[in-house]
Amino acid sequence: AQLAQLIHERSTDPRIADWLGACEADASLPGDPRSDAAVNLREWRRDYDRATKLPAELVVELSQTTSRAKAEWAEARKADDYARFAPWLDKIVELSKRQAECYGWPDAGEPWDALADGYESGMTAAYVAGVFTPLREKLVVLVDRLMGSSTPPSNTFNELKLPLAEQEAFVRRVSAAVGFDYQSGRLDTSSHPFCSGTHNADIRLTTRFAEDNVNDALGSTLHETGHGLYEQGLPAEHLGTPRGDSVGLSIHESQSRLWENQVGRSLEFWTWCHPILVE
């Protein structure tokens, strides 16, 4: 919480507004909105404006609550006890609503828009509905057809048992083969897979293992490898600026889902991967 407070204080320093204003008024800067300078200035302005809308007290309370909630979630997940985590989730939702009120949203929008904008600039619930509503209609028909099929899918792979050490060696080999650079990253285990790091030469992946579910480890690792590949591919020369950062959550998730689903569930992938698994 103290670190969150310090970051908020630094991010909302009034001098930043002066610096941004001076840059925005500088006629010598490139006029092309796609130039490095223009992109950085636009994103720094956006970040500053959003940060100054939040009171420090709310930032601290959010940090304290989410930190404690994460520990409770880990224990609740381990015990399969949702009731233990539910009060923390309720509190996070209430704090998120307050956060949305601080940010504000257009008259035609809704509170979710204010929060989504922090993950994907300009994203709205109306836009998401326009994408997923017609997709859902087709998926319902597809699922009904599959559920009514007289040929059930084989569950052999999902029931395959493999010692954890062998699973780890397997998924490491696969993630390296699809491009993850272990000289600039690493893979560890956690209760829930994630990807993090400080820059594109230090990318940390985690996955999870279960002796009776190799598929979970492989899918999780491919998913996080997709995130890691995107991060490792960011331009190092722009490190520390918006130009050197990911553009948003949708692109990030498109890369993780590409490797987990489009590649990882394809016949071509398994034609290559199966011999490695049975070695």
Task: State each model region's role.
Residues 192-198, 242-252:
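Beta-rich nucleic-acid/ligand-interaction surfaces
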Residues 104, 209, 216-236, 253-260:
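Active-site recognition of the HExxH zinc-binding catalytic motif
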Residues 85, 109, 151-156, 238-243, ...:
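Short, glycine/acidic-rich hinge or "gate" loops at secondary-structure transitions
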Residues 245-279:
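Post-HExxH zinc-binding segment in Zn-dependent metallohydrolases
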Residues 1-89:
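N-terminal helix-rich structural modules
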Residues 45, 201, 233-240:
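Short acidic (Asp/Glu) and glycine-rich catalytic loops that position anionic groups and cofactors
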Residues 177-183, 228-237, 263-270:
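Secondary-structure transition/capping motifs at alpha-helix termini
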Residues 62-216:
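Contiguous, non-catalytic segments that form substrate-binding/exosite surfaces or channel walls
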